[in-house]
Amino acid sequence: MTETTENVVITIPDKTSFTFHEAATSPSEGEEFVVGHFRELTVKISGSSTSREIKFYAVDENGEKTALSGTNKTDFQLGSSTLNTNEYWDFDIAGLFKVMFEVVSVTGDVTVKGIVVS
């Protein structure tokens, strides 16, 4: 998408990837993604962990976390956390400030990566 302001042309990317956790082996809040102009997020949870719990959050300008529900792409169930791995989740993030995926517990390693689109 391209926006023009007077004589300045600004190109806004339509799609980008982001890593929340890379092979995390201990509980962690991970990286927060600043939503900006993006509207949709697809997250892949993978890794060799034999058990894990991941909670999904929206984070406001004051750093306050609120549970964020997403749709599991396998069974189309809504959820704000998961105990599974090797799955994809979709989130509507339009209007949010930041999103994060907290690894509450893990045995082994877990990776959480996302692709956002505007």
UniProtKB/Swiss-Prot annotation:
This is SPbeta prophage-derived uncharacterized protein YomS. It comes from Bacillus subtilis (strain 168).
